[in-house]
């Protein structure tokens, strides 16, 4: 028995040594939660599927505070992230849940979120057979009466045995607008886009089909140099709404004809995104 116990002890020590070597190969778990004035931010991870890992950044805002979408509207700062310092991570992409329009207090409107928002991330591993650590630097802005920039550094060890937050990430991904073709018969949908050349500057007239009377539409240019205004809505019969948007905010010297615009239509809990070219005059 004593010999068996001794052997068991040596085997246990050997197992611990091997386990220790494996754990030493993994970076220590760093902070997954950070706080800034008006918000707290959490980095979470879900399931690992081959080289793909679901993750997310959740921003939980204090009452009366807001943060911004990828296109902030008339004012604001869009979120940005970097993953330098990550280990065994080849790439990270972010998805954007459907936003809302808010008054910015200065006569304009901003686009973003109140309460809480979880940005789904898709993480690509360089080698799925090796330990991985996700390091995220997240720059964003939070606003109450005034806006302030914020930055948090978050990290976590990606664990194939984890995934307890998979349901939260999946629920957030379900709120990301789905791609849809122009003129689709589904609801919601963007039915048509026309150019009104009688107006100065020219304006886009966009007809959409929606079920919610508070349905809203947002327009983005092909790159960050475009600063398009927010479309204004007129309700029409049979669940159709018309949005009008001056073709303003186009970069100097750029002919907008044919440029791809991204239209995001938010219809209550449903949202779609449609890419359309600017019509020719």
Task: Walk through the language-model features, giving the residues of each.
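N-terminal secretory signal peptides that target proteins for export/translocation
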Residues: 1-8
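Intrinsic disorder/low-complexity segments
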Residues: 5, 14-16, 186
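Bacterial N-terminal signal peptides
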Residues: 11-24
């Amino acid at each position: 028995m004593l010999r068996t116990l001794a052997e068991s002890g040596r085997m246990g020590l050997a197992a611990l040594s091997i386990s220790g070597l494996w754990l030493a190969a993994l970076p220590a778990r760093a902070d997954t939660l950070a706080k800034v004035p008006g918000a707290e931010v959490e980095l979470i991870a879900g399931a690992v599927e081959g080289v793909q890992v679901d993750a997310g950044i959740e921003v939980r805002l204090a009452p009366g505070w807001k943060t911004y979408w990828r296109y902030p509207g008339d004012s604001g700062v869009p979120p940005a992230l970097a993953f330098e310092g990550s280990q065994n991570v080849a790439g990270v992409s972010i998805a954007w849940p459907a936003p809302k329009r808010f008054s910015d207090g200065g006569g304009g409107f901003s686009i973003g979120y109140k309460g809480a928002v979880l940005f789904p991330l898709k993480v690509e591993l360089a080698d799925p057979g090796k330990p991985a650590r996700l390091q995220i630097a997240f720059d964003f802005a939070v606003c109450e009466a005034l806006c302030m920039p914020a930055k948090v550094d978050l990290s976590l060890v990606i664990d194939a045995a984890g995934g307890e937050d998979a349901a939260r990430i999946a629920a957030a991904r379900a709120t990301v607008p789905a791609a849809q073709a122009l003129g689709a018969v589904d609801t919601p949908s963007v039915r048509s886009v026309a150019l009104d050349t009688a107006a100065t500057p020219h304006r886009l007239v966009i007809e959409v089909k929606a079920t919610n009377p508070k349905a809203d539409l947002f327009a983005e240019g092909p790159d960050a140099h475009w600063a398009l205004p927010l479309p204004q809505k007129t309700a029409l019969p049979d669940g159709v709404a018309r949005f009008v948007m001056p073709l303003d905010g186009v970069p100097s010297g750029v002919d907008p004809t044919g440029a791809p615009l991204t239209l995001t239509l938010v219809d209550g809990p449903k949202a779609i995104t449609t890419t359309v070219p600017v019509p020719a005059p």
